[in-house]
């Protein structure tokens, strides 16, 4: 246990001695030094600079993911405290945590946007941590954070187990190695073993139980309470002092200890699980350990656990109670011991798969065998009231230096870097360089004009303008952009006066720059501006920021469901030819999955409404043989712009934006002197509108968003809740299951059978008497109702659910997809839209 001054005593020894933990090793550049010579100062400056060049194998880029209220921010706060990053522990309820610094976060007690912070832990490991939101409305924050992470800490609530949002983010992080922390073990009803079984079955993973909960009575009359953990790897009992977060006792477990048999069982399960795939461990176990589970050294076990974690064969599981300061140090040890460094993490998805990419201990990644090539991804843009626009990036290869000229391969624009910053939540530290694996910030007056979320930055590691030396294929490198989920709610936004329109547009531009999952649609004919988002809370927060943070002179309308239209048949092929040599021929039709296979080339997504553009190749010209002054990329982007605007004009039934359409440009011709996109815009957009206008109204159908809904209720409330769902809310009930009863989960495929068997065979300690007492008191577990429900019927559902269940019910919903509205629902939809 490197995080405390450890002199172990055996389990049966007395008296009990608490050991005060040492938070974080003191770095050289933090030392206080008296009078020194000029030579010493030079040496000190060199060592300070050198100390910042972190060994890439000792870097961990991690995120904390979980369902809302599982304890992500509370756990983050304890990590920062025990690492020595902060001197006082903040509280979510008091609104003074480090990573929740937005006014809306502090007033509501929830995380709204991801926050990055760096700290050191044990043996000079650098941990770059991103705390992510748990609410489904802010899922885009999770998606873009996951793109730049190498490992994850998944937190489960020991009472609630695996919840709906947990399953969702687990799938989103499918390719990322994880450790799991079962939190809130101090709460009445906490069930460690039940939570582990749900983890195995619902998330389809094997587990490695690194520690198990320890309960003890604090006095003779009290019920047992959660006090610490049994460490199966190190063979210790770790007990935390409830009165002092800085005190912990560590006791070696010998054969005389009451917990020895539990330790042996946990060790046996750990070694057996690892031995299924780790030949090195099997050889050691049968050889030097003589088949004795207790003789396998900690170092050998740790190496095997690390191999299993990196290969994603299994997930290490730990437990604790972050609010009570229990179990956080072992979790931090697991982060640095088992999660990957940037030199071991998954490779980023690159557009050019012909260029070789490999891990490199110095460079992070070696792309095209070019040690001077720096590659970075912009994953977030924010605006600081003092520093202005700030672009968060992850460096994948090479070194990014301030003052160097870089190339945005997503836009084809060169620009000079201003300041580079390392962020510690909302506190900035100016730095000169970002190294492989670093998560940092580009700052400067014009940086937001040059870089957006999802852009790829290419730079030379040593030369200020070295990008000139790169090959064309290297400059064209792009990391796969960040996918943006489709919005399902909308609200009208209008300026308070006509003179406020410019200020409104500027505020909306800034807001969508920071949050691309907000989609702004402007109707040029009516002048109406509509803001689209992921949910009611998402739009509520956006409106709050517009009014209170940006001081925008606007009025925001009532939040409403975002409906779409689609076409049921293809349009006629339309052709347009101009006197100056522009010629286009196209049609619009309904999208189907086969289109992507048929048109593997020239296939471009059009925003987030499942619309696509297909451009057939010209027999005379292509991207490699392009004679026009206008760049090929600008040619394509101009057509994309035309398509998006034309489709947003909407269909004939209700004027809702069009969804699931393909615009197929079959033939095209440009004059050889084509240098600007204006003529393309003037030709293509009216052509698309003409094609759509030629269809009769009957060729259009209204689409409405359908949601995956999970409602958790007690048995006595089940009937009224189901009746309300199937009657008033037009729900399609999929299943009704016992809450937490993992063994009754639907077994529909071979994988699920496999993980049911694994859960049955997994060694688990019996759950605490506190958990059993809760079950006995209630006499029953809850029920989970799973259903597909039109989003229109779920608006303000929480109020109805509280009334039906006397406040005992809860629900979670996520977007499933768009579905054609039945004829009996169309009238209600049109009425809601005031049409």
Curated annotation (Swiss-Prot):
Gene3D superfamilies: 3.30.70.240, Elongation Factor G (Translational Gtpase), domain 3 (3.30.70.870), P-loop containing nucleotide triphosphate hydrolases (3.40.50.300), Translation factors (2.40.30.10). It is found in: Mitochondrion. Keywords: GTP-binding, Mitochondrion, Nucleotide-binding, Protein biosynthesis, Transit peptide. GTP binds at residues 66-73, 131-135, 183-186. Belongs to the TRAFAC class translation factor GTPase superfamily. Classic translation factor GTPase family. EF-G/EF-2 subfamily. This is Ribosome-releasing factor 2, mitochondrial. Coiled coil: none annotated. The keyword Transmembrane helix does not apply. One of its GO terms (biological process) is regulation of mitochondrial membrane potential. Residues 1-50 form a transit peptide. PANTHER family: RIBOSOME-RELEASING FACTOR 2, MITOCHONDRIAL, TRANSLATION ELONGATION FACTOR G-RELATED. Mitochondrial GTPase that mediates the disassembly of ribosomes from messenger RNA at the termination of mitochondrial protein biosynthesis. Not involved in the GTP-dependent ribosomal translocation step during translation elongation. Residues 57-343 form the tr-type G domain. One of its GO terms (molecular function) is GTP binding. The gene is MEF2. It comes from Eremothecium gossypii (strain ATCC 10895 / CBS 109.51 / FGSC 9923 / NRRL Y-1056). Pfam families: EF-G_D2, EFG_C, EFG_III, GTP_EFTU. GO terms for cellular component: mitochondrion.
């Amino acid at each position: 246990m490197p995080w405390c001054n450890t002199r172990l005593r055996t389990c049966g020894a007395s008296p009990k001695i608490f050991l005060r933990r040492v938070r974080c090793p003191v770095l050289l550049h933090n030392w206080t030094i008296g009078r020194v010579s000029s030579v010493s100062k030079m040496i000190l400056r060199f060592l300070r600079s050198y100390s910042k060049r972190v060994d890439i194998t000792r870097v961990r880029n991690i995120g904390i993911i979980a369902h809302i209220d599982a304890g992500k921010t509370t756990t983050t706060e304890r990590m920062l405290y025990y690492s020595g990053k902060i001197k006082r522990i903040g509280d979510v309820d008091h609104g003074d945590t480090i990573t929740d610094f937005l006014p809306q976060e502090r007033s509501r007690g929830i995380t709204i946007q991801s926050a990055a912070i760096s700290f050191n832990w044990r043996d000079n490991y650098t941990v770059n941590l991103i705390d992510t939101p748990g609410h489904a409305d802010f899922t885009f924050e999770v998606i873009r954070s996951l793109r730049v992470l190498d490992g994850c800490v998944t937190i489960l609530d020991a009472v609630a187990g695996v919840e709906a949002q947990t399953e969702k983010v687990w799938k989103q992080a499918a390719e990322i190695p994880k450790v799991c922390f079962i939190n809130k073990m101090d709460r009445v009803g906490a069930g460690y073993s039940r939570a582990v079984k749900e983890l195995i079955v619902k998330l389809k993973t094997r587990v490695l139980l690194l520690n198990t909960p320890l309960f003890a009575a604090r006095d003779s009359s009290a019920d047992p309470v959660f006090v610490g953990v049994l460490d199966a790897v190190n063979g210790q009992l770790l007990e935390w002092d409830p009165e002092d977060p800085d005190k912990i006792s560590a006791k070696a477990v010998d054969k005389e200890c009451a917990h020895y048999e539990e330790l042996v069982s946990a060790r046996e399960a750990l070694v057996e699980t690892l031995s299924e795939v780790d030949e090195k461990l099997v050889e050691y176990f049968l050889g030097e350990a003589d088949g004795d589970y207790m003789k396998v050294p900690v170092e050998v076990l740790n190496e095997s656990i690390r191999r299993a974690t990196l290969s994603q064969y299994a997930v290490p599981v730990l437990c604790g109670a972050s609010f009570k300061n229990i179990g956080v140090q072992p979790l931090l040890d697991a982060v640095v011991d088992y999660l990957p460094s940037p030199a071991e993490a998954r490779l980023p998805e690159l557009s050019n798969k012909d260029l070789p990419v490999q891990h490199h201990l110095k460079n992070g990644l070696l792309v095209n065998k070019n040690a001077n090539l720096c590659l970075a991804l912009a994953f977030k843009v924010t605006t600081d009231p003092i520093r202005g626009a700030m672009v968060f990036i992850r460096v994948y290869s090479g070194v990014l230096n301030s003052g160097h000229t870089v190339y945005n391969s997503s836009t084809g624009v060169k620009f000079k870097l201003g300041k580079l910053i390392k962020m510690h939540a909302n506190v900035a530290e100016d730095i000169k360089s970002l190294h492989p694996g670093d998560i940092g910030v580009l700052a400067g007056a014009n940086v937001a004009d040059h870089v957006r979320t999802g852009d790829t930055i290419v730079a030379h590691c040593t030369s200020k303008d070295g990008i000139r030396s790169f090959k064309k294929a290297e400059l064209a490198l792009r990391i796969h952009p960040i996918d943006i989920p489709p919005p399902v709610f909308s609200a009208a936004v209008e300026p308070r006066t006509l003179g406020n329109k410019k200020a409104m547009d500027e505020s909306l531009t800034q807001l969508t720059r920071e949050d691309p999952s907000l989609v702004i649609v402007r109707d040029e004919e009516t002048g109406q501006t509509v803001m689209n988002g992921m949910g009611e809370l998402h739009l509520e927060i956006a409106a709050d920021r517009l009014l209170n943070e940006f001081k925008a002179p606007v009025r925001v309308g009532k939040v409403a469901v975002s409906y779409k239209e689609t076409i049921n048949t293809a349009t006629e092929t339309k052709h347009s030819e101009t006197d100056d040599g522009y010629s286009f021929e196209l049609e619009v039709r309904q999208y189907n999955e086969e289109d992507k296979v048929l048109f593997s080339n020239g296939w471009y997504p059009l925003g987030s409404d499942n619309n696509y553009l297909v451009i057939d190749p010209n027999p005379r010209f292509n991207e490699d043989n392009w004679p026009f002054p206008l760049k090929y990329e600008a040619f394509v982007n101009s057509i994309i712009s035309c398509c998006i605007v034309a489709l947003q004009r909407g269909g004939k039934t209700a004027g809702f934006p069009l969804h699931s359409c393909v615009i197929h440009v079959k033939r095209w011709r440009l004059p050889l002197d084509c240098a600007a996109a204006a003529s393309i815009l003037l030709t293509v957009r009216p052509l698309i509108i003409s094609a759509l206008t030629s269809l009769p109204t009957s060729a259009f159908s209204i689409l409405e968003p359908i949601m995956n809904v999970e409602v958790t209720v007690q048995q006595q409330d089940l009937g009224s809740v189901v009746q309300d769902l199937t009657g008033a809310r037009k729900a399609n009930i999929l299943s009704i299951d016992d809450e937490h009863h993992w063994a009754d989960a639907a077994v529909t495929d071979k994988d699920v059978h496999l993980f049911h068997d694994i859960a049955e065979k997994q060694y688990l300690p019996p759950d605490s008497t506190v958990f059993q007492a809760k079950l006995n008191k209630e006499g029953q577990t809850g029920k989970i109702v799973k259903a597909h429900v039109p989003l229109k019927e779920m608006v303000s559902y929480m109020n109805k659910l509280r009334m039906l269940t006397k406040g005992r019910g809860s629900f979670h919903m996520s977007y499933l997809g768009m579905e054609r509205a039945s004829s009996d629902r169309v009238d209600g939809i049109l009425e809601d839209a005031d049409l």
